[in-house]
Amino acid sequence: SNAVKTFSVPGQNIIYADINGNIGWRPAVKIPIRKNAKNLLPRPGEDSSYDWEGFVPFNEMPFLLNPEKGFIATANNKTIGDSFPYYISNQWASPSRIKRIEQMIMDRMFTNVDFMQEMQMDQKSHLALEIVNHLLQTKSNGNELINKGHSILSEWDFIESPDSKGALVYHYIFNALLKNTYG
């Protein structure tokens, strides 16, 4: 845990185990102390009231030690609660990757090199699983193309392999939803 004090790069999470059987997590970053930082608007550079006021002290940084669930995983997801008093970011990855990792670990509750390789190569999309269930509830109104899409999605195993018809249909619809929703 103390080794992280001297290692800091943007967005790095360190998960460790020690010789006493402890497992832990620490962010290996220097978090600047910033006033009014909880949004993405640019700040006027000539106004010193927005200057950084140093960095969050190591002993006030978030950490995790020996969680009850028995393992620690991160996947660029939000790793801190809303009660953490310093602003880190409001740009976190979707929780779908961490949910998938946690699901795989919980299903096995053991690890070895082969299992770690399997997790690294896993192509199952937790996000697609959530979204496709909603898409399949939509009505086609007799549209042949929509019926074909429904059929492909209803048979899809949520594996996003390069040759997957289900992945192609899902991403086409998902991108159209984003474009039609946000422009």
Protein language model features and the residues they cover:
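Alpha/propeptide regions of enzymes that mature by internal proteolysis
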Residues: S1-S8
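Segments that shape or occlude catalytic/ligand-binding pockets
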Residues: G11
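Long, compositionally biased non-active-site segments enriched in small/hydrophobic residues and glycine
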Residues: D18-G183
